[in-house]
A protein has these predicted regions:
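Zymogen propeptides
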Residues: 1-273
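Short, surface-exposed loop/turn motifs at beta-strand boundaries within globular domains
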Residues: 14-17, 303, 347-349
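N-terminal nucleophile
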Residues: 62, 129, 310, 351, ...
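Conserved, well-ordered active-site substructure
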Residues: 170-198, 202, 206, 317-321, ...
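A short "linker-to-beta-strand initiation" element
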Residues: 210-239, 294-329
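Short catalytic-site patches enriched in acidic/histidine residues
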Residues: 263, 269-276, 309, 316-319
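A generic structural motif
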Residues: 275-281, 409
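Short nucleic-acid-contacting surface segments enriched for D/E, G, S/T with interspersed K/R
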Residues: 284-292
Length: 444
């Protein structure tokens, strides 16, 4: 079904880079899957915030209030005067906490009793966590139950690998409609769009004849259906998303979409979510349900959108061709992943690249990265820059390829075992910590 080999490269400064290379025969056996939510995933995310995020990025972090909701908590749809009709319970609670909790002298102040009671109810059930940086601001961070551990799912699978970017840090949460653990980027399987494209980043595609390419696919090129209603940009609506737009026009109506769900409906003039988009119409839309379907890529066998391209037509990509948020440009509305390293040639990290060889057969590469704690130069991999990864991919015979989510998420499991090391580590023991992810690719 596939072959796997490990190669070790030595950089000029004597640091090493280990790379796992998988080669497969065809694309028909590769499928997307979403690991089941694990209770440990929320606790691990909270630990990552407390032990790493607020320490490394302390001066751009305030007090982070992370929360998730128990399955038995029932909340009605809420017609909020500022945010509109909220259909997602996470949005309802996020709006409540944003409106009715203040931070004073690093202490939470509740404006009303109902908010305080809900907060303590969630806290008593282990659904609340606080992680504080240096800034005197409160960030309300709802956590979606849409992520889990690759190693705990489909344990008899031949191969599993992580795939998509997902919202993970406080700067990714730009509005009440956003939540952590939201998948970002196009996923297509046998003509079905599992997750919509965002931010017009590059997409690795395989058509039904097995030909691969790196191309751009925009939301504006797709049909969007809610119930029996079809929406198409420029025909009966405008499709608005970051970074082109921060707010919708004041006239008309907005359907707020994240992934495959309408999360809210409101009048125009509001913020656009950082992890979704807005269908803006002049006519009051009907909303028979909140499920969203996408069409227009039925000729695709497989497609995935995440990071920058690595190789196009056999030539390594030597610069950013896809856009990423730059913290040094605060006038541009942030969009995830907001803390993506932007030094193309020098920022080293764990990487995952998916692509095809010159015969359009699948290749997947894992570039092992330095451990967050206890890294030993020359004994462990230091990670690859985007430029270094692209050059190695081309050297190994890749024709077309793009980066998937890297960093602490990067991992390949063959027969449910890893041949390289994870970069997330325990700060005391330096043991590997598997990071929960929103989706993966699997070969049974």
């Amino acid at each position: 079904m596939f072959t796997s080999e490990i190669k070790t490269y030595t950089y000029t400064n004597k640091e090493i880079q280990r790379v796992q290379i998988l080669r497969m025969e065809d694309w028909h056996h590769i499928s997307f899957f979403q690991p089941a939510y694990a209770e440990d995933a929320f606790r691990q995310l909270c630990d990552l915030y407390s032990n790493y995020m607020v320490k490394k990025y302390a001066y751009v972090q305030g007090t982070n209030l992370l929360f998730t909701l128990p399955d038995d908590l029932r909340l009605p749809w809420t017609n909020h005067p500022r945010y509109g009709v909220l259909y997602d319970p996470l949005c309802v609670v996020s709006a409540m906490f944003r409106d009715h909790i203040l931070l004073r002298n690093k202490q939470l102040i509740f404006k009303n009793k109902s908010t305080e009671e809900l907060y303590h109810q969630l806290q008593d059930r282990g659904c609340i966590h606080l992680a504080s940086g240096k800034l005197p601001i409160l960030s309300v961070l709802p956590v979606r139950k849409s992520f889990g551990f690759l190693s705990q799912e489909n344990k008899d699978a031949s191969m599993k690998v992580n795939v998509s970017f997902f919202t993970m840090n406080s700067l990714d949460i730009g509005t009440v409609y956003d939540s952590l653990a939201t998948s970002i980027g196009l996923c297509v399987q046998r003509g079905e769009i599992l997750n919509p494209p965002l931010f017009d980043r590059e997409v690795f595609t395989v058509d039904k004849q097995g030909k691969t390419a790196v191309r751009r696919i925009s939301l504006k090129d797709l049909d969007i259906r809610i119930g029996n209603k079809r929406y198409r940009d420029g025909e009966n609506c405008r499709i608005l998303y970051r970074p082109e737009h921060s707010y919708t026009p004041r006239h008309g109506y907005d359907l707020i979409v994240v992934g495959r769900q309408v999360t809210a409906f409101r009048r125009g003039g509001g913020l656009i979510p950082s992890s979704g988009f807005v269908i803006h119409t002049d006519i009051l839309p009907e909303l028979p349900d909140t499920q969203v379907r996408y069409g227009g890529l039925e000729d695709m066998l497989f497609a995935v959108q995440a990071g920058n391209s690595a190789v196009i037509n056999g030539i390594p990509t030597n610069r950013f061709l896809s856009s990423f948020h730059d913290l040094k440009k605060p006038w541009i509305p942030p969009y995830p992943p907001t803390l993506y390293p932007l030094d193309y040639a020098r920022d080293r990290a764990p990487r995952i690249v998916i692509g095809a060889d010159m015969q359009d057969q699948p290749m997947i590469l894992w570039f092992e990265g330095a451990g967050k704690y206890g890294y030993q130069p020359g004994k462990e991999s230091c990670g690859a820059s985007l430029k270094e990864a692209a050059e190695i991919c081309a050297e190994l015979g890749m024709k077309n390829g793009v980066h998937l989510d890297g960093g602490g998420s990067a991992q390949i499991l063959c027969a449910n075992k890893r041949e390289l090391l994870l970069s997330d580590r325990d700060p005391v023991t330096y043991e590997e910590n598997e990071r929960a992810v929103v989706n993966g690719l699997i070969v049974q």
